Amino acid sequence: MARPRRASTMQLGLFLAALLLLTPSPAGSVAAAKGGGAKSGGGGTVIGIDLGTTYSCVGVYRNGHVEIIANDQGNRITPSWVAFTDGGERLIGEAAKNQAAANPERTIYDAKRLIGRQFSDAEVQRDMKLLPFAVVDRNGKPHVRVEVKDGDVRVFSPEEVSAMVLTRMKETAEAYLGEKVTRAVVTVPAYFNDAQRQATKDAGVIAGLTVDRIINEPTAAAIAYGIDKKGAEKNVLVFDLGGGTFDVSILAIDNGVFEVLATNGDTHLGGEDFDQRLMDHFVKVIRRKHGRDITGDARALGKLRRECERAKRALSNQHQVRVEVESLFDGVDLSEPLSRARFEELNSDLFKKTMVPVRKAMADARLSKGDIDEIVLVGGSTRIPKVQQLLKDYFGGKEPNRGVNPDEAVAYGAAVQASIISGHVDENTESMILLDVAPLTLGLETAGGVMAKLIPRNTVVPTKKTQVFTTYKDKQTTVTIQVFEGERSMTRDNRLLGRFDLAGIAPAPRGAPQIEVTFEVDANGILSVLAADKATGRSEKITISGDDRKISQEEIDRMVREAEEFAEEDRRHREQVDARNSLEAYVYNIKNTLGGKMADAMEGEEKDKVEEAVREAYEWLDGNPDAGKEEYEEKLRELEDVCNPVMSAVYQRSGGGGGGAPEDGNVDDEDDHDEL
């Protein structure tokens, strides 16, 4: 059954924002009508590119439908491989992959597993041991060192390698269209972080492309599935298992409106990992049968990798294959049987691992298994029978929809989005609205290290959220805005994205200034933060770029996992901070009272008693920064027992006036804001 669409004022605003974003300009519509393709008024055709870990694909929306463009070899998908020969020739695509076994050290692949990451990332360190080419550290980021021709050694960033693949996609489109292409929509895994998205955009720039939009791969695939679907709302789960990454997204599709309800994934899980399990297995077989360890022989490993990939593909249609490599090493041939059952056993834990993001996405979307109307399979690895069976079993025997090409669906959706962005609409796309989401919670640090969450994970983007904060100390003229990403309630457990200062605040008592902080996430998932002093109008802004959001997928998974495992710990920390803040606020209010008109109405003994209690409370707070929740609460009760009777008596003697505090000693402030 269809899930009711989330309805709220914020949702309506997001819907209208997306509508405005995607509504074509009149100029764009005219240009498109004349050319019949995805053109804008002067910008040329906009293409859609699926930049994959192992294969890439390019498409264009023309004459009412998407055309997936074949490369010069006649293939509609192109290997994301780059190589350099002895003569200095650069090879891209099939030509690079076909010579890899003979030239492993100078053949580069899996750049998508390096892009936007830190050299120190655990995944990068693991991959380095498996890759035949050299991965080196440059300013904390992984780069590829390769001999481009005899004696000429070059170092390339992952962005540069990806740009080479994008260039080939661009050239493929130009050859087909007969015109120069300068604009594109490029897809990324839904769980790519900001640094990886920014790096992908940079790769486009290097390739001579303006990347008009970064779009999530499963969302693009959902467009491919739903572009011609009319009628009642459907909840669709997109299961995207490719060569190197894995995403799960759940969308509500209703007459051209594509609303992402939840997304989850693993940016380091895919067909390459299944190949590696086969590699490890046969390396052990060779060691046992021939007494030879080939892990240091890059050429032998290259030959074995190619055969393992072929065997994996064949086992999707056959129950047994033979893995054969002539002259694997020293004239020794490899010829070993491999059954589908053995392949499934070797990868059992990885296959089961794909179900974890499914369960998490379902929970975040607040859907039951019966609420899912369609399951869409995307990515070549979804052809593996065991993966299909696990998914089918999870959904009680529900058969996946096989109506989209798993290799081409992502590029298909990107091409549709490219057409809309360019201003070209027709009866298929005129009502299409895309509402995607932010994968992680965004917020800032408030007093006590508490995370104030402004944009929760799975919030529809583009989005903007404004909240008012105040100062923590008297006469505070500067506040530091520290921006974090993560699911924990304490900022120390989340990822710092960036920080900046807002200076020039007029000196005032603690709690008086009003600092308006605005978080804005654009359609590409890029975050901007603006802080402004409402009194003076002074403001500062920061855009969280790739250099600020260096966060690995392992860290993302850790954040969410720890948030689930340590929810109780988070609750205790938050309660502790709240209890301390309550005590501090009470002490501060009493201190203010002692300096105001009410103090004149106090008798000498009363004033001395309250002043002594406040002084002792200040000293106790200074000496007990890490006290427990119960200790703070007990100290507050002790202080109230001393101060409240005095305040009440004075308040009554003054006839309820005199600007005093209410009976509990707290000032009623309708502008009660979290403190920075």
Swiss-Prot record:
<comment type="similarity">
    <text>Belongs to the heat shock protein 70 family.</text>
</comment>
<feature type="short sequence motif" description="Prevents secretion from ER">
    <location>
        <begin position="673"/>
        <end position="676"/>
    </location>
</feature>
<dbReference type="GO" id="GO:0036503">
    <property type="term" value="P:ERAD pathway"/>
</dbReference>
<feature type="region of interest" description="Disordered">
    <location>
        <begin position="650"/>
        <end position="676"/>
    </location>
</feature>
<keyword id="KW-0346">Stress response</keyword>
<keyword id="KW-0547">Nucleotide-binding</keyword>
<dbReference type="InterPro" id="IPR013126">
    <property type="entry name" value="Hsp_70_fam"/>
</dbReference>
<comment type="function">
    <text>Functions as a chaperone during endoplasmic reticulum (ER) stress response.</text>
</comment>
<keyword id="KW-0143">Chaperone</keyword>
<keyword id="KW-0067">ATP-binding</keyword>
<dbReference type="GO" id="GO:0005737">
    <property type="term" value="C:cytoplasm"/>
</dbReference>
<feature type="signal peptide">
    <location>
        <begin position="1"/>
        <end position="27"/>
    </location>
</feature>
<feature type="compositionally biased region" description="Acidic residues">
    <location>
        <begin position="665"/>
        <end position="676"/>
    </location>
</feature>
<dbReference type="GO" id="GO:0051085">
    <property type="term" value="P:chaperone cofactor-dependent protein refolding"/>
</dbReference>
<dbReference type="Pfam" id="PF00012">
    <property type="entry name" value="HSP70"/>
</dbReference>
<comment type="subunit">
    <text>Interacts with ERDJ3A.</text>
</comment>
<dbReference type="InterPro" id="IPR043129">
    <property type="entry name" value="ATPase_NBD"/>
</dbReference>
<dbReference type="GO" id="GO:0031072">
    <property type="term" value="F:heat shock protein binding"/>
</dbReference>
<dbReference type="GO" id="GO:0140662">
    <property type="term" value="F:ATP-dependent protein folding chaperone"/>
</dbReference>
<dbReference type="GO" id="GO:0042026">
    <property type="term" value="P:protein refolding"/>
</dbReference>
<dbReference type="GO" id="GO:0044183">
    <property type="term" value="F:protein folding chaperone"/>
</dbReference>
<dbReference type="GO" id="GO:0034663">
    <property type="term" value="C:endoplasmic reticulum chaperone complex"/>
</dbReference>
<keyword id="KW-0256">Endoplasmic reticulum</keyword>
<dbReference type="GO" id="GO:0005634">
    <property type="term" value="C:nucleus"/>
</dbReference>
<dbReference type="GO" id="GO:0016887">
    <property type="term" value="F:ATP hydrolysis activity"/>
</dbReference>
<dbReference type="GO" id="GO:0030968">
    <property type="term" value="P:endoplasmic reticulum unfolded protein response"/>
</dbReference>
<dbReference type="GO" id="GO:0005788">
    <property type="term" value="C:endoplasmic reticulum lumen"/>
</dbReference>
<dbReference type="InterPro" id="IPR042050">
    <property type="entry name" value="BIP_NBD"/>
</dbReference>
<keyword id="KW-0732">Signal</keyword>
<dbReference type="GO" id="GO:0005524">
    <property type="term" value="F:ATP binding"/>
</dbReference>
<dbReference type="InterPro" id="IPR029047">
    <property type="entry name" value="HSP70_peptide-bd_sf"/>
</dbReference>
<dbReference type="InterPro" id="IPR018181">
    <property type="entry name" value="Heat_shock_70_CS"/>
</dbReference>
<dbReference type="GO" id="GO:0016020">
    <property type="term" value="C:membrane"/>
</dbReference>
<dbReference type="InterPro" id="IPR029048">
    <property type="entry name" value="HSP70_C_sf"/>
</dbReference>
<protein>
    <recommendedName>
        <fullName>Heat shock 70 kDa protein BIP5</fullName>
    </recommendedName>
</protein>
